[in-house]
Amino acid sequence: MGINVLFIYPNTFGMNMLPPAIATFSAILKQHNHQVQVFDTTYYAVDYGIDSDGSKEQGLNVIPFSKEMEKKNLRIKNTNWKTDLKKQLEEFKPDLLALSATEDMWELGIHILEEIKEYKQKNNIPVLAGGVFPTFAPEICSKHDLIDMVCVGEGENALIDLCKKIENKEDHLDVTNLWVKKDGKIVKKNTISNPVDINKNPIIDVSLFEENRLYRPMAGKIYKMFPVETIRGCPFTCKFCNSPDQM
């Protein structure tokens, strides 16, 4: 039967690359009979951050593409993200909320969780934080009272194990890659699992996202595209970058 998993992707307009991790997790979870949805803020007017691609256009860093976006009808939604999210929660009734974020997305992610704090607490829904920022700053991410677990590293195996334990109403303190909190304090920092063989991952589930998320500006035109993951980490060892730590 499985459980309902709602991914929260606190993205800002202009950062249009579809997140391959969430699309991969969706495909894997569906293979294990779980139901998956995503709340993606990319096309909402959230009054947060900047329009990345738009600012590049204004700064003459890229060929203007605004008219091309209008032709594709790629515009900010005219609905309120708070209303839409609460409606999705009531209809989907998630058993797990999974926040995926980079450092620049983290504050918006927390803002979203604050907005649904009452619903989360009333229905006792656990929140898992994962992604680049939680992986490299689990101490910071785990401090927030609305975060129940932090995934450090790859999430494929951790998500499968966690969802199975939630479905069976079992304790999830021993799920690898997870830092788990109880009563507001970290009670378990589990070990990191062996690297995932990405060649065994299924094709990403792009159906999880609205079609407009497949469009992205390039050279002044708007193209339909999606990312393909061929490797994780980076073979280079630049002093200013944290990627070598992943290898």
Predicted segments with their positions:
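Residues that mark the start of a beta-strand
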Residues: 2-5, 35, 224-227
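Glycine-rich beta-alpha loop elements in corrinoid/cobalamin-binding modules
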Residues: 7, 21, 25-29, 37-43, ...
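Glycine-rich, highly charged phosphate/nucleotide-binding loops
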Residues: 47-89
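Generic structural signal for helix capping and beta-alpha/helix-loop junctions
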Residues: 15, 46-48, 53, 106, ...
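Glycine- and acidic-residue-enriched helix-capping/strand-helix junction motifs
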Residues: 13-22
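Radical SAM [4Fe-4S] cluster-binding motif and immediate context
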Residues: 199-247
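Nucleotide-activated donor-dependent transferases that construct or modify glycoconjugates
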Residues: 3-14
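Core AdoMet radical
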Residues: 13-14, 95-105, 225, 229, ...
